[in-house]
A protein has these predicted regions:
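Receiver (REC) domain active-site loop signature in two-component systems and cognate sites
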Residues: 57
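Active-site residues of response regulator receiver
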Residues: 54, 84
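Charged docking surfaces used in two-component/phosphorelay signaling
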Residues: 17-25
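Acidic, metal-coordinating helix/loop segments flanking the phosphotransfer/catalytic sites
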Residues: 32-50
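His-Asp phosphorelay/catalytic-motif detector in bacterial-type signaling
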Residues: 47-49, 74-81
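Conserved acidic carboxylate
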Residues: 10
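C-terminal output helix
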Residues: 109-121
């Protein structure tokens, strides 16, 4: 699995901790944020290779975050994987075309399988460094 800089946006500390530890153990450089605005501010300084995004966060939901993210020239093509407890509700709200426009490359419903998520993260990061083709949805 390739190494990459990953930003994890998740307001639930327990879930964020699991993600950060799993990604870090897989060799990724991980930054964690409980607030979307803090992540947007950090992206102005250092653009990651990938973002894992919870859609339901206080102060700024995932849709607002994605819209603000895409206004940043350096982050227009930045891949995002949604990790959300909204599950089927979210899948109904975000169709494939909307996902493509927002740069969403995958959606994982909570509770998610860590090994599957890690494999998918690795494929997204490897794809970015190799061919620019999108991996199949998980």
């Amino acid at each position: 699995m390739g190494q990459g800089r990953i930003y994890v946006l998740e307001d639930e500390v327990a879930v964020r901790t699991v993600l950060v530890e799993a990604l870090g153990s897989a060799g990724h450089d991980v930054r964690e944020f409980g607030d979307g605005q803090l992540a947007l501010d950090e992206i102005d300084r250092a653009v990651p290779d990938l973002i894992l995004l919870d859609m339901r966060m206080p102060r700024m939901d995932g849709f607002k975050f994605l819209n603000l993210l895409r206004r940043k020239p350096a982050a227009k093509a930045l891949p995002v994987i949604i990790v959300s407890g909204l599950g089927d509700e979210l899948l109904r709200a975000i169709d494939a075309r909307a996902a493509e426009e927002l740069g969403v490359v995958g959606i994982f419903a909570k509770p998610f399988d860590i090994p599957t998520l890690l494999r998918y993260v690795g494929s997204v990061i490897a794809r970015d460094t190799r061919s620019g083709t999108r991996p199949p949805n998980p």
